[in-house]
Design a protein with these regions (language model features):
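Acidic helix N-cap motif at the loop->helix transition within catalytic regions
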Residues: 52-56, 83-92
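Acceptor/aglycone-binding surface of glycosyltransferases and processive sugar-polymer synthases
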Residues: 100-106, 110-120, 125, 137-214, ...
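Cell-envelope/extracellular polymer assembly enzymes that use nucleotide-activated donors
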Residues: 40-42, 73
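Short beta-strand/loop segment that forms part of the nucleotide-sugar
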Residues: 70-81, 102-103
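A conserved acidic beta->alpha catalytic loop
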Residues: 78-87, 133-134
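Short, well-formed alpha-helical segments that are part of the catalytic scaffolds
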Residues: 50-65
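Donor nucleotide-sugar binding loop of glycosyltransferases
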Residues: 50-53, 81, 110, 136
Length: 260
């Protein structure tokens, strides 16, 4: 039987989310049965102050998984939220054996949260999505099939029609054009939160700093060159407000690109 564990982070026990000098180790984990299991999909959700969306999002994912008879886990990584996100994540993980919850001591950033989720992911295919419900879980089956049937190393979503203000969409277009030219990878939406990977891809890369923007480039540098793209739905934000700024985000992204 599955047994729940709620513990203080112990590097000797798990070491799931750290590299040598990384100080962003989780404070708490709610995890079921840490013996590795064979499963189809791990859904990794980095989150920061998204308490309003979590029950609805996880229920939607569960419906999609059940309808398609997938074996799966949902890994929610709370990046130091100051709202009720952790309490909700903890409750959801006790109510559903498929949900695992991890909490950071403070806000370390999306890259750290993704890296932590990647290190814990057990599924043959790892799918990432944002917690704000602007990514649709209904995209999961098609992304899974592209990895498994067409043998892609990773698939990046492309939000071709967006519901963002121009202060965000214009810098995003400039960023993507620059990333395409620099890397030679012909993607339209490098930073789309909705992506799918073979498990071995996420286990072969280290996502740190602000490098979540460049995961396709990191994967390519690690030898995974079959990278595809799928047009995905971009849903209008239902709860809360965006956590990102337009011009600052673009400038930081360009500086990170120069460091790769």
């Amino acid at each position: 039987p599955l047994q729940k564990h709620s513990i203080k982070y112990s590097p000797d026990l798990f070491s799931p989310c750290s590299w040598q000098d990384y100080s962003g180790a989780p404070e708490k984990m709610n995890l079921f049965n840490r013996n590795f299991q064979i499963m189809d999909i791990s859904v990794v959700i980095p989150l920061y102050n998204e308490d309003e969306s979590l029950p609805e999002l996880t229920a939607w994912i569960e419906r999609v998984m059940a309808a398609n008879h997938f074996t799966y886990e949902i890994i929610m990584v709370d990046d130091g939220s100051s709202d009720n996100s952790w309490a909700l994540s903890e409750t959801l993980s006790t109510q559903n054996e498929h949900i695992r919850a991890i909490k950071f001591r403070r806000n370390y950033g999306k890259s750290a949260a993704l890296h932590c989720g990647f290190q814990n992911a057990q599924g043959d295919v790892v799918i990432t999505m944002d917690a704000d419900m602007q990514d649709s879980p209904d995209e999961i089956p098609a992304l899974y099939q592209m990895i498994m049937s067409e043998d892609y190393d990773m698939i990046s979503g492309w939000k071709k029609k967006r519901f963002d203000p121009k202060s965000k969409t214009i810098p995003t277009k400039l960023f993507n054009a620059t990333a395409r030219k620099f890397s030679g990878i012909h993607l339209h939406d490098f930073n789309c939160g909705l992506k799918a990977y073979k498990n071995k891809v996420v286990k072969s890369i280290e996502v740190y700093g602000e490098m979540h923007r460049y995961i396709p480039i990191l994967a390519q540098q690690a030898g995974f060159t079959k990278i595809g793209e799928k047009v995905v739905q971009h849903r209008a934000r239902k709860y809360g407000v965006t956590k990102f700024g337009g011009l600052n985000r673009f400038i930081n992204g360009m500086l990170d690109l120069l460091s790769i």
